[in-house]
Regions:
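Hydrophobic/small/kink-forming positions within alpha-helical transmembrane segments
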Residues: 6-10, 41, 63, 67-71, ...
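Juxtamembrane helix-entry segments on the extracytoplasmic side of multipass membrane proteins
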Residues: 22, 30, 52-55, 128-152, ...
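C-terminal transmembrane-helix exit sites in multi-pass transporters
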Residues: 44, 75, 93-117, 192, ...
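Cytoplasmic-side transmembrane-helix entry/capping segments in multi-pass membrane proteins
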Residues: 1-3, 54-65, 108-121, 140-144, ...
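Juxtamembrane helix-loop boundary signature in multi-pass membrane transporters
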Residues: 1-2, 97-148, 152, 166, ...
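Transmembrane alpha-helices of multi-pass small-molecule transport proteins
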Residues: 21-68, 153-157, 176-191
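Loop-to-transmembrane-helix transition segments
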Residues: 1-4, 43-72, 141-150, 195-213
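Helix-helix packing/entry segments at the starts of transmembrane helices
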Residues: 85-91, 164-180, 215-247
Length: 287
C-alpha cells in the first residue's frame, strides 16, 4: 500500500511537471490512456472475459465521468500547490456518500455524517486565506473549483463502480476509462498536441507507468488486507505529495493548508474505518 501511495503521488507530480513543460492536459491524458488500454487488454485476456462487458451503457457512463473528472484533477494538479490539489481529491467520500444514499439507498451512519462535517470544516480552513482578499485570484478560484469538480466526478465514478461491481470484471471496468479517454482527447485536443523534448516524454511515460504501478499495488494490497487499513494507508499519498511539492516545486504548505489537511484527513480516515469490506474491489477499480 505504501508503494501504491508513492506511485500515485509520483504520477501526480509528473502531471504537474508535464504541465509546467507546456504539454497540454489532453495530451497528458491521451498518453496515460494509451498505456492503460494496452495493459488492461493484457489483463483481460489473461482473465478470459469479454472486454466490452455486459452493462455497456453504465460502463460507458463510468468512463465518460472519469474522463471529465480527470481533466479537472489534472488542471488542479498543474495550477494549485501539489499537496493542496491532492488534498481536494480526498473530499470524494463526501460526494460518494451523498450519491450512494440517493442512488443506491445506502444509509450513511452518524459517524460518516460527522466525518463529512469535519472534512467540510477542513476545506474551509484550507482555502479561507485565499478567499479573504477583496479580489481572490481568478486562476486559484478556477483551479479550486476544478479540484472540487474532480472530487465530485470521482464520487460519481465510485458510485457507478459500486453499481457495476456485481456484474463486471474489475479489469473491464478499468478499461472503459481509457477507452473513452483516447478518442475524446484526440477529438477535443489533438490540434494542441506538441512533440515534447526528452524531459517531456519522460514525464508522459512516467505518468502512464506510475498509474499502472499504483493500480497493481493497490489491487494487491486490497487482496491481502482489510479495506479500512488499506484505504487509510492510501492517505499517505498526501504526505508524499507534500514532500514532492517541497523538493521539486519549492512549495511549502501554509499553516492553514496543514490545519485544513489535518481535519480532512481525520474525517477521511475515520470514514474509511467505518466502511464495509466490500469496498475493496470498488476502490481498486476506481483508481
Amino acid at each position: 500500500m505504501l508503494l501504491s501511495a508513492l506511485a500515485f503521488a509520483a504520477m501526480g507530480g509528473l502531471v504537474k511537471l508535464a504541465g509546467g513543460l507546456g504539454i497540454p492536459i489532453m495530451q497528458i491524458i491521451f498518453v496515460r490512456a494509451v498505456i492503460s488500454v494496452a495493459l488492461c487488454l493484457v489483463a483481460i485476456r489473461r482473465a478470459h472475459v469479454h472486454p466490452l462487458g455486459q452493462r455497456r451503457g453504465l460502463l460507458l457512463a463510468r468512463g465518460t465521468v472519469g474522463f471529465v473528472a480527470l481533466i479537472a484533477v489534472f488542471y488542479a494538479f498543474i495550477q494549485l500547490p501539489y499537496a493542496q490539489a491532492t488534498m481536494l481529491q480526498y473530499l470524494h467520500p463526501l460526494f460518494t456518500t451523498a450519491l450512494a444514499f440517493y442512488f443506491l439507498a445506502e444509509r450513511p451512519t452518524l459517524a460518516t455524517l460527522g466525518c463529512i462535517v469535519v472534512s467540510l470544516l477542513g476545506l474551509g480552513v484550507m482555502v479561507s486565506p485565499y478567499l479573504q482578499t477583496d479580489m481572490p485570484d481568478r486562476t486559484y478560484l478556477l483551479a479550486l473549483l476544478a479540484g472540487l469538480g474532480g472530487a465530485l466526478g470521482s464520487g460519481v465514478a465510485y458510485t457507478l463502480v459500486r453499481k457495476l461491481a456485481s456484474s463486471e470484471h474489475p479489469s473491464v471496468i478499468v478499461l472503459y476509462f481509457p477507452m473513452v479517454c483516447v478518442p475524446a482527447t484526440l477529438i477535443l485536443g489533438v490540434r494542441e498536441f506538441i512533440w515534447p523534448d526528452l524531459a517531456g516524454w519522460t514525464a508522459l511515460l512516467g505518468v502512464g507507468l506510475f498509474t499502472q504501478l499504483g493500480q497493481l499495488s493497490l489491487t494487491r494490497a486490497m487482496q491481502v488486507d482489510s479495506a479500512s487499513r488499506t484505504t487509510s494507508l492510501s492517505y499517505l499519498q498526501i504526505v508524499f505529495a507534500a514532500v514532492l511539492g517541497w523538493l521539486f516545486f519549492n512549495e511549502i504548505p501554509s499553516s492553514a493548508t496543514l490545519a485544513g489537511a489535518g481535519l480532512i484527513l481525520l474525517g477521511a480516515v475515520v470514514s474509511a474505518w467505518n466502511q464495509p469490506s466490500r469496498q475493496n474491489s470498488d476502490h481498486a477499480a476506481q483508481k
